[in-house]
Amino acid sequence: MTARLRPELADIPAYTPGKTVPGAIKIASNETVHGPLPSVRAAIEKATDQLNRYPDNGYLELREHLASHLDKNLGAGAFTPEQIAVGCGSVSLCQQLIQITSSVGDEVIFAWRSFEIYPLQVRTAGATPVQVPLRDHTHDLDAMLAAITDRTRLIFVCNPNNPTSTVVDPAALKRFVEAVPPHILVVIDEAYVEYIRGDQVPGSFGLVRAHPNVVVLRTFSKAYGLAGLRIGYAVADADIVTALGKVYVPFSATSISQAAAIASIDAADELLARTDQVVAERDRVTAALREAGFTLPPSQSNFVWLPLAERTLDFVRRAAENRLVVRPYGEDGVRVTIAAPHENDAFLEFARNWIGQP
């Protein structure tokens, strides 16, 4: 190849998604088992009538729906459409946030392990990733504060954390945000927030209103079941939203994805009720794994984390032999999606047999 590419890209691996194996049970990508509601399907079908036209690049109708949805849940006037940005999945917004804050010589802090895309996107931008080890499978916020330097531009807090399934205590998160210098962007990545229960539900939108340097990311891929359409959003200060628009790939949020997201917002109560089924299965799977002898942190997501260390690859290999596709993370552990009950039963049968083997 004769084209001159950026030499630093040679050392940056491509993102590796969960595998899809025909005929196997895929519990590797944290997808919901529920398909779109009839009303969402109808909106998608209607949107196909206009596929010869470009989508709304300003996604105005979707932003208005999101603002109204937030008003309904947080109180009138919580956020305006000007405080909402839409992206091709929240992962694209992660990249945009890095682009508007960080370049060569700058630093971006995040926990490790956390979302695997963070270090790849940071390095692609030419910035330096600063990985702060987890403590008890969750963010060590004190250590993250200690990692801040005069080169820090952005901090990601993946909450619930992917892949370890844990959440940060809401009061601790509030103290953390208050302690971060106001010129540093704090991005709270809440792809799995709809699966949090009890007193661990974060008040992240309140943090956005109180602190102009805080951004909350949400997605329609998980609880809303639109992973195949790639659409997510950010809630932030209007100046940050304006900056995000400058690095947005034009028309990347398609007409179909916008229509599906709007219909999903209209059906939010019905869609989010489905998460109760997932949570019930999560609790059942967690209890069964612990009873079988596994050690795992309490999950507040639609997946569980098995910190298997040096036994990780053996677990993954043997699972594949049993037509189960799980997600390995080096020799740290395995992430397992909560699926349909019969799929969870198949996984539990394998897991019980595996842990009893030498």
Swiss-Prot record:
Keywords: Aminotransferase, Pyridoxal phosphate, Transferase. SUPFAM superfamilies: PLP-dependent transferases. One of its GO terms (biological process) is L-histidine biosynthetic process. Its cofactor is pyridoxal 5'-phosphate. Pfam families: Aminotran_1_2 (PF00155). GO terms for molecular function: aromatic-amino-acid transaminase activity; histidinol-phosphate transaminase activity; pyridoxal phosphate binding. It comes from the Bacteria. The modification N6-(pyridoxal phosphate)lysine is found at residue 222. InterPro entries: Aminotrans_II_pyridoxalP_BS (IPR001917), Aminotransferase_I/II_large (IPR004839), ArAT (IPR024892), HisP_aminotrans (IPR005861), HistidinolP_aminotransfase (IPR050106), PyrdxlP-dep_Trfase (IPR015424), PyrdxlP-dep_Trfase_major (IPR015421), PyrdxlP-dep_Trfase_small (IPR015422). It is an enzyme of class 2 (transferase). Homodimer. Aminotransferase that catalyzes the conversion of aromatic amino acids and 2-oxoglutarate into corresponding aromatic oxo acids and L-glutamate. This is Aromatic amino acid aminotransferase. It comes from Mycobacterium sp. (strain JLS).
